[in-house]
Amino acid sequence: MAALSEHFTLCGLLTGTDDGKSEILGVEPAGEPDRVLVTDSVQAVTLYKVSDQKPQGAWAVKQGQSITCPAVLNPESGEFIVVHDDKVLRIWKEDNVNLDIAFKATLSADVCRIHTLPNTDPLVLFKGGAVHFLDSLLTDPQQKIGTVLSDGERIVWSEIFADDGQPLIVYLTQQFSNYFVYIHKFSPVCVCKYHLKPNTEDSTILDCSGSVKSKIFTLLTLYSSGQVCQTPFPVSLINKETERVVSASPLLQLSGPIEVGALNFLDESHVAVLISSSSEQKECLSIWNTTFQTLQAARNFQQRTSAQLWCYDNKLFVPHGKTLVVVPYVCEASCLASVLGKSRNIQTSVLENVPFVNWDKLVGKDPETKPSNAGAQKKTRERKTNANAGNGTESILYPFDVQNISQTQTEAFVQQLLLGKEDTDFQITVGKITQGLVKRCMADPKFYPQSSFVQLVQTNTLSYSLCPDLLSLFLEKRDVPLLQLCLHSFPDVPEVILCSCLKAFLSISEKLVNAAQINTELASLYIDVGDKDKEHKYTEHPEEPSVLQNGFSPTALEEDSCDELIAESLPQTTQKATCPISIKRAVLVNSILISPYNESFLLPHLKDMSGDQVMFFLRYLLYLYLKFNENITINHPGKQMPTVSQIVDWMSMLLDAHFATVVMLSDAKALLNKIQKTVKSQLKFYSEMNKIEGCLAELKELKCPARVSARYSIEVLQLY
C-alpha cells in the first residue's frame, strides 16, 4: 500500500519566463538524507535542509550568465559542481561564499547533465551523446569531445544507475517523431542504441524513469495518450551491435490524453505520476501500484505546475505556482489481499495509528450490552484490576506499554486481555502486545513470560508476518513446545525458519526434550518407541506372513534386489520396527513434516544441515514410511499426522540436498539400501495395481445383454 502525507512549502521560486511560470532545473541530493540542492532556471543554486525548510547556503553566477545544468554534489570529494553557459564548469565547497572565485574549467563541448553515484567519479554527459569521467576532463578541459548522436537528434531525458557497483548511463533522444534509447556501460566500455517504437501512434513521450534489477534495466515512459509503458533491456546483452528496434508494452492506463506530465519510479512495485489535462485547470499527483495496476493515493493541485517531479528520501518535490512543495509518501510491500483491503499482515506503521481495545468496555462498564452473567464477570474483572492497581503499577491501564511491568503482572494482564475476544480490535491488540513482549524479551534476557506467549499464540490470530521476531525468540530460548505451537498456528512460516526449527528439534538434548510439555497421546497410537540408544531395531515374530500388506514384505525385498547380496540377509519373518527417536522428539519433527513449504525455497536451507542430522532424520522418515505401509487399512488418528506423500517428499528433498554427503558416510550404506529396496517394492506394487486397473476398465466397457428374470445368478470372472 502507499499513502501521501500533507505537503509543505520548501521555498519560493523566481520567475524565469515571460509567461510567469516558475521552473527549476533540478533538485538533487546533497549528501545527507535531509538536504537537497535546488537549481533554479535563473542564476542561483541553493542548499536546503528539508525538515527545517531553511536554506543552508546559496550561490549565484554573475549578471548575464545563466546556469544550464543542475548542480550536483560529488560524493567522493564533498564538492558541488555546476555548469553555466553550457561549457563552463564551476567546482566549490560548501564553505565558499562566492562562486566567482570557485574553480573554473571551460570545456570544448556543450554539457547536457552531470550524473553522480556513491563511490564513483562524476560522469559528464555532453549534448552530442558522449560520456566522460570528470577527472579525465579536468586533466585536459579542451580535449576533443566526440559525437554519438545523429543530426537533429537531441537528448530529452537522462539518468544514472548502478549495476553491480558499476555506473550505467541511460538517456532518451528525440529525432523528429522518433525516439531512441542509448545505454552506456563502462566495464567494459560500450554503447548500445535502441529504436523505441511507441505503443500507440501519434503519441509523444512526456517523461521517463527507470530502474535496474537482476541485470535488467526497465524503462518507464509516460505518453501523451495517457499510457505508462515499460520496456525491459537486458544489461548483460548490451554490446556494440547495430541499432535494434524495441517496443514499449502498456503498464498503466491513466485518464485520457494529457498535455504535460512527469513520472518517477519509487520502488519495484510503485510509481508516482504528475499529470494535467486540458479539460481541467488543475493537476493530479498520484501513486500507482504497477504490480496490480491500482491507484494507491492521489493529491490534486488547484494551480498549474511545471510538470516536474523529483523523488529523494521518501519525499516528492513538485514546483507548484511560485513555490517548491514537498510531499512525503509511504510505500509498503503489497500483496493482492492488501490491494483489496483484506490483508491480515498488519505492518507496525499501520498499528501505531489504529484505535485499540476500549478498556472501559472490556472491564464491563456497559451492562446494557452484556449478557445475563455480565455482572459476575464485571466483579471478577474489577477485582483483577484493583489487585493489579494495588501492586503499584499504572501500566496495566495502558497495555501497550509492557516494557516496565513485572512478569507476574504481564501474565495477569494477558489473561485479562483474552476476555475481550469478541472485540473488533482483538487481533490488532494481540499483535501489538506480542510485539511489545518480544521487544522486551530481546532487551532483557531474564524476562520471558512463557505462559503469556502460549495464551497469545493459542488465540490463532498471530502470524509470522505480523510478528516476525517471535519465532526467532523461541529458537533462541530453545522453547520447543512454543515452536511446535507456532508451526501449527501460523500459516506463513518462511522456509528458512522452518529449516531452523527442524535443526533445533533434531539437535536439542534429550534432557530438554523430555522436560518439555508435549502432548504425545495421539503419537503413541502409531509410534513404537524401543531402545532409544540403538539406531534401528527389529524384533521377530514367530509366524510367517500370510499375505503381502500394501505390497511390502522383507521376502519381496530380498528377491527383487538388484544390488549384490549382503552377508546377513533379512529374516524371512514379519519385522516390527521401533522408532529411532523418542516419542516427544517425533511429535516435534512431525510438526515440521505437515507444515506448508515451497520446495524451491526450502532446498537451499536443507543443505546447511550436518551429516549426523541428515542420517538421524532419514532414519526417522524411513521408520514412518515403513510404519504407515504395514497395513493399508490402518486409520491414523488426528490432523497432526504426516501423510505418506509428505514423508516421501521430505525424504526426496533430503536426499537431493545431501546425496553426495550421504554416500560418503560409512553408516549410510545399509540405510540407503533399505530405502532403495522399499521404493522398488512400492514401484512393483503400483505397477501391479495399474495392470488391475486396466483390466477393470476393460470389464467396465463390456456391455452385457439385459436379462429379465425373477431369479438371480452369480457370475465368477477370472482375471488371471
From Swiss-Prot:
InterPro entries named among the record's database cross-references: NOL11, Nol11_C, NOL11_N
Highest taxon of the source? Eukaryota
Major localization class = nucleus
What are the start and end residues of every segment in region (Disordered)? 365-392
Q: Which GO terms describe its biological process?
A: maturation of SSU-rRNA; positive regulation of transcription of nucleolar large rRNA by RNA polymerase I
GO cellular component terms attached to this protein's record: nucleolus
Where do the TM regions start and end?
none
- Keywords on record: Activator, Nucleus, Ribosome biogenesis, rRNA processing, Transcription, Transcription regulation
- GO MF terms, alphabetically ordered: RNA binding
Q: Where in the cell is it found?
A: Nucleus, Nucleolus
Q: Which PANTHER family match?
A: NUCLEOLAR PROTEIN 11
Function (record text)? Ribosome biogenesis factor. May be required for both optimal rDNA transcription and pre-rRNA processing.
**Name of the protein described by the UniProt record:** Nucleolar protein 11
Per the record, the gene is: nol11
